[in-house]
């Protein structure tokens, strides 16, 4: 590609509405342009990257024996009503009617469509297992699209769906998809981790996320220092303290605390160790529990894990925190004065709270706290459960090492769905015994557009993007200095350009009449990994300058060795 025949729409200034670095650099590098909230046009440079990501995904899915299909973005509402997700999905599901007043949706996912297809096409266990995938546009009407293509409304996704007659068959395909995903992100040159994850609204029995590590990530990822254990913080078990609870050494006493409505204020004003305080959080209970609220207790320096709390049998899902009005109606005090002593609602204590002694908590009277609280002496030990987020230094759940926490960006997710959709939609086949059998399903997604943004978040510096070779828009940039004034500079540039193309290398020749500084800045901004600078002075000694975008090194290469050198660099 020649810049004179290409749309290189780079920007010097960062647009004011771009919050994260990937959004800023995708705009500045001329990869995308905003059309409306959460909607983006992909320009040539961005599309080249997107297509390379897409091709790697497609190749590895084919290698894993998945079969490519293409399903409509527009889906009839009756399929969503049949699966039960019409009511469950909420406002992110864009619903509309056609001219015949028939209801439809813009698909955010395709479980219903693929299940409908399979129940009409597959009739016998002999045809299974099968795994179908597509790379297709999705639409989710996000309440607040942000971060560019990281959280947009329209996006490109690879989704795959497998169908089985046994859990063993599903497990085999699940493991094959796990390996395929690992190969995909490795080929892209990304630093990623597969982690145990919650199944969320998709449902199912097992789930792994594939997280690209980046300081700007939205997810907290937990790792063990002593094993390969890794999990999303939502799912990481907080192990119970190994030490037994210490004996009581303080008397129970009530203290006036009119200006201490938070744990931080209590600690500061009364010089209490934060590890000797307890937070009491009231959430709505399930109707069938016979109670309106449930109290959840976590240590003052810990955070409630809402995913874990939501799975408690007496807690309403989704988790809803009680309002101050609801709290006062039942307890008679505000949220800043709550505690477990004489609390007239069901109580669930985190494992770490159950191991505490001589601790402080609200007295359920405005402006008062109890200090010196001890289990069994001052109140019975309530139900105990793991309901907190782990913190760095906690023991690993597998008993090997301690935990570290890093930030990650979710780019892939695989699920063992089981029979959630096939049961609801009556997707069956004739089994080996001649009876109808409900299909067992798996689903496997990769956010293709999100991968592009995540790669930038992980690979950039103050000058722009630093693409891994496999997904760079161009692998090599040829930068001839004043080529329009020097025949030999122009001749070598053309020769290298044509030779590299003949070797299948994506190369861009900057043949603009621009200052060298502009040419260098643009190629660094769009992230070309390898650059060749051709100048008259260096040609006197039959040399050119090579620049590596990632390590920043420069070296002189003999003109006759340039091609072999570059091929070696790109393959390395």
Curated annotation (Swiss-Prot):
Its EC number is 6.1.1.15. It is an enzyme of class 6 (ligase). Pfam families: HGTP_anticodon (PF03129), tRNA-synt_2b (PF00587), tRNA_edit (PF04073). The keyword Nucleotide-binding applies. Catalyzes the attachment of proline to tRNA(Pro) in a two-step reaction: proline is first activated by ATP to form Pro-AMP and then transferred to the acceptor end of tRNA(Pro). As ProRS can inadvertently accommodate and process non-cognate amino acids such as alanine and cysteine, to avoid such errors it has two additional distinct editing activities against alanine. One activity is designated as 'pretransfer' editing and involves the tRNA(Pro)-independent hydrolysis of activated Ala-AMP. Homodimer. This is Proline--tRNA ligase. The gene is proS.
